[in-house]
Regions:
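Long, charged N-terminal interaction/targeting segments
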Residues: 1-89
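Cys/His-clustered metal-coordination modules, chiefly Zn-binding fingers
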Residues: 75-138
Length: 138
């Protein structure tokens, strides 16, 4: 199988194996970035030679500016691996990144929802409940 066909297979594999919804974006450097899950859980960057799998993460740079800072889980040189080995390894990396991300969620003591860490106001209180229960001002 030639490289362009394999590249398209990788795209199809990612779109069907990442947690939905999957947002696919072409980047200026020619790579394809996939951000999956709601809220975001896994970030995958696909280049002409490698697949980088990361756990979604980020920081609030200001009160209104959130900057994504994915945490790398693993990189695969997809041209060097046989198809079965590549897809098996990629599935494990995606599963690991998702599990790492979900393990950081916290349950809000007011509403009981499992909430991404960037949307927690304090330990145990999500931002939405903090606005309602404590009069937080933004």
């Amino acid at each position: 199988m030639d490289a362009p066909e394999r590249y398209e297979q990788l795209i199809a594999f990612l779109e069907s194996n990442l947690p939905p919804p999957v947002d696919r974006q072409e980047t200026p450097d020619g790579s394809v970035q996939f951000i999956s899950g709601e809220p975001a859980e896994v970030v995958v960057s696909l280049t002409e030679t490698s697949v980088l799998v990361s756990e979604f993460s980020g920081v609030w740079e200001s009160q209104f500016t959130f900057a994504a800072r994915p945490r790398r889980v693993g990189v695969l040189k997809w041209r060097r691996l046989q198809e079965t080995a590549l897809f098996n390894a990629l599935a494990v990396l995606i599963k690991g990144a998702r599990e790492m991300r979900l393990s950081r969620f916290q349950v809000c003591r007011y509403c009981g929802r499992s909430t991404a860490p960037e949307w927690m106001h304090d330990d145990g209180v999500c931002q939405a409940c903090a606005d309602q229960h404590s009069g937080a001002i933004h």
